[in-house]
């Protein structure tokens, strides 16, 4: 008598293409697939893999976090590469001169970078300037900073748990707070 083996968990799920139908993203993927294949560069392979990622895994990076990362020793004059969105941060008074390459840069962040004498590049411009990733710093936004992530973890109410409960209404009486 044979054993009914479950084969559904055997396959390792790896993205080979982006789910998005964005034509510009598809062109970047085409370019970096070619570069990764022909150059055997680790940098190009990482960029290619990050282009495949979902929006959640391509978390936005704020201008303040970007400058903090680029101020580290040995990173002066290098190109900050973000495969995602660079957003403005109004809490920051002054923005230093930066060269940023990103999939998307918000209007506020773009004006502040350019006003500081910096430069904003697209991913295809980076392929021409640094085809092997020389003089670049790969950065990414914090993935766990999403509001939804606060609800993940051990059940709220369990000792030592800081998980946020799902509450539909916040009424005067705590007992009346209905949980989803």
Curated annotation (Swiss-Prot):
InterPro entries from the UniProt entry: Ribosomal_eL18 (IPR000039), Ribosomal_eL18/eL18-A/B/_CS (IPR021132), Ribosomal_uL15/eL18 (IPR021131), Ribosomal_uL15/eL18_sf (IPR036227)
Organism taxonomic ancestry: Eukaryota, Metazoa, Spiralia, Lophotrochozoa, Platyhelminthes
Keywords: Cytoplasm, Ribonucleoprotein, Ribosomal protein
Chain coiled-coil ranges: none
A Pfam family matched in the record: Ribosomal_L18
Broad class of the protein's primary localization: cytoplasm
Domain of life, source organism: Eukaryota
Spans annotated as Disordered: 152-180
GO terms for cellular component: cytosolic large ribosomal subunit
Cytoplasm found in the keyword field: yes
Protein name in the entry: Large ribosomal subunit protein eL18
Keyword Cytoplasm: yes
Residue stretches of biased makeup (Basic and acidic residues): 170-180
Subcellular location: Cytoplasm
Similarity comment: family membership: Belongs to the eukaryotic ribosomal protein eL18 family.
Molecular function in Gene Ontology: RNA binding; structural constituent of ribosome
Organism: Taenia asiatica (Asian tapeworm)
GO biological process: translation
């Amino acid at each position: 008598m044979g054993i009914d083996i479950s084969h559904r968990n055997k396959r390792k799920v790896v993205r080979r293409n982006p789910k998005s139908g964005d034509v510009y993203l598809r062109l970047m993927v085409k370019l970096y697939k070619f570069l990764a294949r022909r150059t055997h560069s680790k940098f190009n392979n990482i960029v290619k893999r990050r282009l495949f990622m979902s929006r959640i895994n391509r978390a936005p990076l704020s201008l303040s976090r970007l400058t903090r990362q680029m101020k580290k020793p040995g990173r002066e004059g290098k190109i900050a590469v973000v495969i995602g969105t660079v957003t403005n941060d109004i809490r920051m008074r002054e923005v230093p001169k930066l060269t940023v390459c990103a999939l998307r840069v918000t209007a506020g962040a773009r004006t502040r970078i350019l006003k500081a004498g910096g430069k904003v590049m697209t991913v295809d411009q980076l392929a021409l300037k640094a085809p092997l990733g020389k003089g670049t710093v790969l950065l990414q936004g914090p993935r766990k900073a999403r509001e939804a992530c606060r609800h993940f973890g051990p059940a709220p109410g369990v000792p030592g748990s800081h998980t946020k409960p799902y509450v539909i209404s916040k009424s005067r009486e705590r007992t009346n707070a209905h949980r989803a």
